[in-house]
Amino acid sequence: MPPKKAAKGKGDPGKAAKKDPTKKAADATFGLKNKNRSTKVQAKIRQIEQNAAASGSKDAKRQEALRKRREEEKRAAEAAKAEVAALFNAIPKKQTPQNFLTRKEEVKESQKIDLYSDVRDQQTDLPLEKRPWINTDIVCKFFLEACETGKYGWLWQCPNGNMTCIYKHALPYGYVLSRDKKKDDTKEEISLEAFIEIERHRLGPNLTPVTEENFKKWSDGRRDRILKQAEERRSNRAVGRSNLSGREYFESNKDKTHEVVGDEEDWDFSALRRETEALAKAQDATAPIVSV
């Protein structure tokens, strides 16, 4: 006959195997206690109960072992984490980044080299009288250039030689580098009227005030002086005693100048001839008469 089909609505057979051992023992001994009081039956019941108890104790031991193993793994993970933190010196969580940066700046400031003292005095064991730089106050130009450009530091080497340079490798006290000087972007501006008043007060008190009458007199005198100078230049030019500059000469002889066209040269000696004749006549007229 084919096996009977499992009734609908009943649980999974596999779940029955997962029942409590005590319940399984009770199911196995159901009816045996009341069926017969023989020794064999009682022994069978005790054996079933012992097996159920042993099965229950195995499950309990397995659970206890699993719990202990998990606790050991947790403790091992915590110990490994603490070892890594101690190895890499991690920053404590209570220390804020701001405090860390402040400490970093303090360390950097303590390692900064002093520009106003010669570090060679700390790096040498020579007596004072044998140090080449001890008898001068002149600052080394290479040292000053390195300070201005920001290249001076603990590893900087002087082109003259650190221990052989005869000049100071230290700035005078109170000296301010050009790169540290604050540029004044705000320039003081004054008005034209204020500038005129300032310049007028600088002239002093012993001056003639400018009036309309004084200005007219000065203007007329200046015009007369210019006309007189022009007349003198014309008279001197007529007698050949011209002291004209190059510019004045060309401006007064524009009609006598010429241009060279192509490769041909056109020389006009008429002007030169007239000037030579005028000069000769002037010399003859001014020559003293000698009696024979």
From Swiss-Prot:
Keywords associated with the record: Cytoplasm, Metal-binding, mRNA transport, Transport, Zinc, Zinc-finger
Taxonomy, superkingdom: Eukaryota
C3H1-type zinc finger locations on the chain: 134-172
Cystine connections: none
Main subcellular location of this protein, as a coarse class: cytoplasm
GO cellular component: cytoplasm; cytosol
Chain intervals with Basic and acidic residues compositional bias: 9-26, 58-76
Pfam family, any one: DFRP_C
Region (Disordered) location: 1-76
Subcellular location: Cytoplasm
GO biological process: cytoplasmic translation; poly(A)+ mRNA export from nucleus
InterPro entries: ZC3H15/TMA46_C (IPR032378), Znf_CCCH (IPR000571)
GO MF, one example: zinc ion binding
PROSITE patterns given in the database record: ZF_C3H1
Keyword presence, Transmembrane: no
Role of this protein: Functions as a component of the nuclear pore complex (NPC). NPC components, collectively referred to as nucleoporins (NUPs), can play the role of both NPC structural components and of docking or interaction partners for transiently associated nuclear transport factors. Active directional transport is assured by both, a Phe-Gly (FG) repeat affinity gradient for these transport factors across the NPC and a transport cofactor concentration gradient across the nuclear envelope. Involved in the export of mRNA from the nucleus to the cytoplasm.
Protein's UniProt name: mRNA export protein 33
Source species taxonomy: Eukaryota, Fungi, Dikarya, Ascomycota, Taphrinomycotina
Gene: mep33
